[in-house]
Amino acid sequence: MSLLPTATVATIARYVGQRVTLAGWVYHKTEKGKLIFILLRDGSGTIQCVTFKKNVSEETFATAQSLTQESSCRITGSVRADERAPGGYELDVESIELIGPSHEYPITPKEHGVEFLMAHRHLWVRSAKQHAILRIRAEVIAAAQEWLNEQGFVRFDTPILTATAAEGTTNLFATDYFDLGKAYLAQTGQLYVEAGMMAFGKVYCFGPTFRAEKSKTRRHLTEFWMIEPEVAFADHEDNMRLQEEFVSAIVARVLERRRDDLQTLERDTTLLEQVRPPFPRITYDEAIELIAAHQGEVEGADPLPWGEDFGAPHETLIASKFDRPVFVERFPSAVKAFYMQPDPERPEVALCADLLAPEGYGEIIGGSQRIHDPILLEQRIREHGLRIEDYEWYLDLRRYGTVPHSGFGMGIERVVAWITGTRHIRETIPFPRQLYRIYP
C-alpha cells in the first residue's frame, strides 16, 4: 500500500463530494463533546477535518482524541464545501491513522522570545507566518530564474571556494586549502560569471555568498543568497533598465501567485502594486543633498560629506521619498569595488547604481558597468592593494576580445523581506547565519 495521499489541501476543491486521503500534521485541535475539529496542514495548505463521534468507530474517535500538536497522520474522509470553514472546505472524517506522535511540542500559542524561536528554528518554520515567508522566498527564486531564462540568459554556476577576493579580503571567511595556501568562501560569483558572459553573452549565477561582517543589524546575514546576471555589450543605462524590468516581473509574479501568503502575513500590498518600470533615478550628489535637506527625519541619517558611503538610516531616508524602488547612481569610485567603470565625463564617480527598496528595506541590488580596458583594470587592482598575479585570469577576459559589459547582484533575502514586509532579515532564510548564531 502506498503511503502517498490521494489529494492535497491545495487541490482539495477538485474533490468535493468525493472520498480522499490526506497526509499531514496536526496544526491545531479543538474538542467539543462529540465533535473534534482537527486543523491539518500538509505543506500545501490547511484544512479543517471534522470528526463526529457517531460517524466513526470508537478506535478512530479515540485516535482523534489522542492527537497532539504536530502529530503526523493520514486522514480519510469526504470533502465538503463550506464557506464558513478555513479555506472554504472541510473533510468529514471516516478514519485516522496516527503515523508519528508529537510529545510536548515546544512552540505553543503563547508568546515566545526571538532567541527561543531561533534556537528552535527547525520547528518554527512550520508556523503559518514563517511558512508564508519561505513560500514567497521560493516563489521569488523561481520567478527570478524563469524570467532570466525567458530572456535568453544561461545559468552559469560559479565556485564557492575561491583563491582571490572580488572586493578585498577584509570581510572574507578564509580556510586552508591543502598545499595551495588560503581559500576563501565566495562573497560574490561576479568575477567568474564575467567569464561565462564572454562565452554565452547573457548569463547569471545563483548561490550562497558569505560576508564575515561583524554586523548585528536587521539587514545583515553572514550567509545569504544572490542572483547575479551579467550581459555583454550592455552599458550602465542598459543595466538599470534590466534591473527594473527584472524586479517588476518578480513582484508581479508574487502578487499573482502568492496572494494568500501575503494575506497570512497581513501585508499591505498597495505600494507593491505600483512596482513597474521606469523606476526613479537620482545621483549620489542629489542623494547627499536630499539627506542634508531632510536632516532629523530618520534617526542616524545625519548629513554626509561627499565621498562617504551611505548607512542603513541614509538609505531609509532616501527611499522614503519615493513610492517605488529608486536608483541611486554614480557613487564615488573610492567607495566602490575596483572593477567598476569610471564615468568618462567625470572619472571620480563610477557608472554604478544601488537599487533601494521603499518602506525602509534599503539596498536590494548593487550593479555597475564593468571596466573593460585591461590597462585601467590593472591600475585599479593595484590601487586597491590587490596582487596582480591573483587576477591574471580575470585580466585575460579583457585581453582576448574585451567588450563593454554590465551586471548586478540581487540579494534574495532583502527582496523577500521587502515583499513580505518582514522587519528582520533572519526570517527570510530557512536557517540564518548571523554573528552570534550558527545553530541549528
Swiss-Prot record:
Family annotation (PROSITE patterns): AA_TRNA_LIGASE_II (PS50862)
Enzyme superclass (EC): ligase
Catalyzed reactions per annotation: tRNA(Asn) + L-asparagine + ATP = L-asparaginyl-tRNA(Asn) + AMP + diphosphate + H(+)
An MF annotation (GO) of this entry: asparagine-tRNA ligase activity
Cross-referenced InterPro entries: Aa-tRNA-synt_II, aa-tRNA-synth_II, aa-tRNA-synth_II/BPL/LPL, Asn-tRNA-ligase, Asp/Asn-tRNA-synth_IIb, NA-bd_OB-fold, NA-bd_OB_tRNA
Signal peptide residue numbers: none
Subcellular location: Cytoplasm
One record GO biological process: asparaginyl-tRNA aminoacylation
EC code: 6.1.1.22
Heme among keywords: no
Taxonomy, superkingdom: Bacteria
SUPFAM superfamilies in alphabetical order: Class II aaRS and biotin synthetases (SSF55681), Nucleic acid-binding proteins (SSF50249)
Pfam families tied to this protein: tRNA-synt_2, tRNA_anti-codon
Disulfide bond keyword on record: no
Keywords of this entry: Aminoacyl-tRNA synthetase, ATP-binding, Cytoplasm, Ligase, Nucleotide-binding, Protein biosynthesis
Main location: cytoplasm
Cellular component terms per the entry's GO annotation: cytoplasm
Quaternary structure annotation from Swiss-Prot or TrEMBL: Homodimer.
Family: Belongs to the class-II aminoacyl-tRNA synthetase family.
PANTHER family xref list: ASPARAGINE--TRNA LIGASE, MITOCHONDRIAL-RELATED, ASPARTYL/LYSYL-TRNA SYNTHETASE
Name the UniProt record assigns to this protein: Asparagine--tRNA ligase
